[in-house]
Amino acid sequence: MEPLKFSKKGQDLIKLYGTMAIEGFDRTDNTHVEVAYSDFQLRAYRDHIRPTLIKHKISTVLDYGCGGSNWALHGFDEKTGQSAIEFFNLNNAYRYEPARDLDERQNVDCVISFDVLEHIFISDVPSVLRNMFSYTSKLLVLNVACYSAAALLPNGENAHITVRPPAWWKGMLDSISVEYPNITIFLICSPGFKNSNAYPEWSANDWESSNTFVINN
């Protein structure tokens, strides 16, 4: 596996997120949230993600930066009452959340990470992405918020510390994906709250097998 070594600032951030997990957090509207990381961020995208998981025959998933996600809990899908494991027809789902000392990282078919990368200190982004790539054998599914959060860190800064435009994230992934040519990437970027756009999925192998030198995806 690709070793994950956080910078000093990255380590300090994890401590702040750990404090938020225990004490809750303040918001920009001057309210306080008692229970942090309680949302299953993937739920809102479940109907868009399921065809991709089925297409790539995904049976095991690692939820990287899972927050409060519970893949075995019934009710993930409101219509059927199914859990996320049932809804996506998975054998197993594992979780990684350093702010809660939860680490089930292992080799899987697919790594999924929602609302995580914007919380990573910018110098640590390449290392975190390589760590994600190193655990998946088929697919990497990412959702990145490209806007400031309502949540505040305990030091008063915005919780979305690395806010960059979608093209920045696409370029970052393009650069790193050549090191993992067999992995397909499905990137969703959110320029605003409840405003998301998905890039067509791609892999570096797709580029190599193209009949042209100009690559447009």
Predicted regions and their residues:
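Conserved N-terminal segment of class I S-adenosyl-L-methionine
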Residues: 1-109, 126-129, 135, 146, ...
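A conserved beta-strand element that flanks and buttresses the S-adenosyl-L-methionine
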Residues: 112
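Hydrophobic adenine-recognition pocket in adenosine-nucleotide-binding enzymes
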Residues: 116-119
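Short glycine-centered segments of the SAM/dcSAM-binding site in methyltransferase folds
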Residues: 138-141
